[in-house]
Amino acid sequence: MSHKYVKGIAAAMILGLGVAACSSSGHSGKSGSGSTAKTTAITEEAVTGVTFTKNFNPFDVNSFASQVDAKSLLYEPLFEFNALKPGVIHPELGTKYAWSNGGKTLTVTLRSGVKFSDGQPFTSADAAFTFNTIKSNAAANYSGLPTITSVAAPNASTLVLNFQAAQYANLFSILGNTFIVPKHTFSSLSNVATAPVANPVGTGPYVLKSFTTQQVTFVSNPKWWGGKPAINQVNIPYYSGNQAATTALAAGQLDWAGNEIPNLKQLYTSKDPTHNHYWFPGGNTVTLWINQAKGGPLADPKVRQAISAGINRQQLSVKGEYGYEAPATSSSGLILPAQQQFLDSKLANDLSPTANAGKVSSILTADGYSKDSKGFWAKGGKEISFSVEDPTAFTDYYADAQLIAGQMKAVGINATVDGVAAPSWFTDVQDGNFQTAVHWGGGAGGTSNPYPFGQFQYWMDNTLTAKLGASAASNYGRYSNSKAQAAITAFENTNNAAEQQKQLNILENIESTEMPTIPLMYGADWNEYSTARITGWATQSNPYMDPAPDDPEVGYILTHLKPAS
């Protein structure tokens, strides 16, 4: 499951009128005329507890727009990245960019002729204001931007960003996950990170039409630079929980969803096999985090290799994840097939989908372990034993934890399950108060970042971890390896593709042999959609964008949709 920290999302579409070409390389063209409304609903899972509060501030992570992934309807980044196609970058408010000064300076040429939804022109002053806001207010840095030393707007169509260190590796966070806001409306806010924005103004393809605690409605922006979208209305209704949203989806009231739904075929696709579809591409690598700071057997790479060999990934996929998340095939940790181009070929298909008890025995015997009187592997009187901690509310991860514990016992490793409340789990993982945990992949920009470097940084960068008891930004296992750190630093300081791949190979092989985390499955980007009334979806045969209804992609996808004929 790709748990998005506090939320999972379902979005839905109902009908729209207008004619627009669907293009995989850019936005849709002009809409046609007509009066039939198009409706889209984004539904929050019950675990989120999202309250409909009229706040569309993109800097505020607790705003309605942020929590339901509606920012990209109203605001736009400089460029749009396709997580499924690394290197494919679509111009949005920016048209081109260039690095200089050893990766410390990024110059962006901005699109001309763009207007905000209130008719005011968009210029470099707005882009500069956005980045200066993040520079001066850490609480506004929702996209995790690196330290900015200065921002300049030498003319109306040029933005210059200067950073403290080389930032080649953070291109997505800078260009693809920072939403540009209008200076003329945001500059008057007392605290831009928390001030409510009830009447949003942006350059995005939609504008706010109405807001109630039961439904929020957007309509297409007639001033949008890409041409008025063919899908001319977007509705976001309130549902009390995931079950209510699933019922609405099955009843045909929603056309687009992003929820994990058990028995999906029975509840959804079988209702209308011609029109009801789903596609769950792998958007992250789910791993078993290993806490090495507490010492003991888990600090031994050979023990971690043995644990990996004892895991039945196929069983996790089928029983824990309903068959929606494919077993990991490579010990590199890369998301496959999306990141195939970055894979060290010798690490291809080196993970068995099933457990290999013989390999477990071979690894541990060579490492000085033998079975004790209880049938568990031990050395010097100390058994290999650990708990797998996951929230009981994350039913799939909790099921995975139970399966792993059983699989370990079957190969002579004494593992148990520690089911906790979700808030406690987040704190325990960040503070290092756990032994192992099933956890989704991450990195700068999360699952929308197409580049693998962020994942390795998330798993291995010791500048982002913390001592036990203190909250870590990432590297929750407190892994420390000077070779890995050197590769991370080298990658960050080069824009040469061959040199970057060299460093990625080093990191992939460290992940493979040291296993600071153990790859389990490819976490799904949840995406259910209906073609009964809407066409132009991102599909496996036309993956023009990561299909899940999440920011920053959802606004881009909406502009590629059109009513079915």
How would you name each of these model-derived features?
Residues 213, 370-444:
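Ligand/substrate-recognition segments at binding pockets and active sites
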Residues 95-138, 154, 160-162, 245, ...:
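Aromatic- and charge-enriched surface segment that lines or borders ligand/interaction sites
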Residues 84, 176-228, 233, 357, ...:
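Gly/Pro-rich hinge or "lid" segments in bacterial periplasmic/extracellular proteins
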Residues 141, 150-152, 209-219, 235-295, ...:
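Extracellular/periplasmic solute-recognition and catalytic clefts
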Residues 123-130, 156-162, 204-205, 232-233, ...:
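Alpha-helical secondary-structure segments
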